[in-house]
Regions:
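An alpha-helical support segment within catalytic cores of ATP-dependent transferases
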Residues: 2-18, 113, 125-196, 206-208, ...
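ATP-binding pocket architecture of kinase catalytic cores
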Residues: 24-138
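Conserved catalytic motifs of the protein kinase core domain
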Residues: 42, 86, 190-191, 211
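Acidic-and-aromatic substrate-binding clefts and catalytic sites of carbohydrate-active enzymes
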Residues: 53-56, 236-239, 277
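Active-site Asp-x-Gly
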Residues: 191-193, 199-258
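ATP/Mg2+ or Mg2+-diphosphate-binding catalytic cores
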Residues: 248, 270-297
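Hydrophobic alpha-helical segments that form the core
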Residues: 260-270
Length: 297
């Protein structure tokens, strides 16, 4: 198994940083890789490994950019290393509890709901006059053209002979691609800085106040459209009704419910391309939701 090897790398990294071996070394598997929590009386840290080549470099940049935009805690990267063929980053271990575990108490839920939507609004208020971000220092003023740049490689993957996507799903993605201009035109306006994976599993809360304590794990953070964040809020703890609260503060353009499924499906395809993940029943269910809303638009 790979986990003992990664734990050993994390322990060595901790020894390098703190001149002492950790007394705690706990590894957890995540979607994109593994996270090792290491601690001793000298300090605590998190060592992160990724299955995707290049993902950690993107995360370092994303964390720095998020910290420039937000007034809540964002993990500081202590160093970026490579051992035994594995890239890793050592980061701060921030205090707080996963918002996935928020108690079902009305006061707690309301405090978190208000805190997190305010924080997302502040993040999305960061806009780029040049438009939507393609790569570093390259922007496109038209969202449809930017989406084409972001997702054309994903479409090629989905439609390729080596992808796991079924013929029916390939047809569905081809149909959605042909409709992208119609679907995205209502939000072809201002860009916003987005986290790009902002479900509450990537948020820590303060167990005393139930407010946001920290934001973790950005994906492809950059200047997109705020709705590229909002559909993620349904992924974990939809009972929090975060999108509903967000819309009370900033109305969304007509057609959001359709775009929600559209963007979510393309995001799933991106993760499949990055990681080889594939869940046909999950994707088919989303396609059915999209088709039903499209038919009644």
């Amino acid at each position: 198994m790979i986990q003992p090897q990664l734990k050993q790398i994390a322990e060595t990294a901790y020894l390098t940083m703190y001149s002492q071996r950790p007394e705690l070394c706990n590894i957890q598997e995540t979607f994109y890789g593994w996270v090792v929590f290491v601690a001793s009386p000298r300090g605590k840290a998190v060592v992160k490994f990724s299955r995707e080549i290049g993902r950690l470099a993107k995360e370092i940049t994303g964390l720095k950019r998020l910290s420039d935009c937000l007034d809540c805690s964002v993990p500081e990267v202590l160093f970026f290393g490579r051992e035994e063929g594995y890239d890793y980053i050592m980061m701060e271990w921030l205090d707080g509890m996963s918002a996935h575990d928020l108690p079902n108490d009305p006061v707690a839920l309301e405090s978190f709901r208000e805190s997190y939507t305010d924080l997302l609004l502040a993040l999305h208020d960061n806009q780029a006059q040049q438009g939507f971000e393609l790569t570093e220092d390259q922007y496109e003023p038209c969202l449809i053209k930017a989406f084409d740049s972001w997702m054309a490689p994903v479409l090629r993957y989905v439609q390729s002979g080596c992808s796991p996507f079924s013929p029916k799903l390939k047809e569905a993605y081809g149909s959605m691609w042909e409709r992208k201009e119609e679907i995205l035109s209502p939000i072809n306006n201002n860009s916003s800085f987005v986290h790009d994976d902002c479900h509450v599993g990537n948020v820590l809360f303060d167990p005393r106040t139930f407010k946001v304590a920290a934001i973790l794990d950005p994906c492809d953070a950059g200047y997109k459209h705020r709705e590229f964040d909002l559909f993620h809020l349904y992924d974990v703890r939809p009972d929090l009704k975060l999108v509903e609260r967000y819309q009370e503060k900033v109305p969304l353009a007509e057609g959001f419910e359709l775009r929600r499924w559209f963007l979510s499906l393309w995001d799933d395809a991106k993760h499949s391309r990055n990681m080889g993940w594939y869940d046909e029943a999950w994707l088919t269910s989303k396609v059915n939701q999209f088709n039903e809303i499209y038919a009644h638009r």
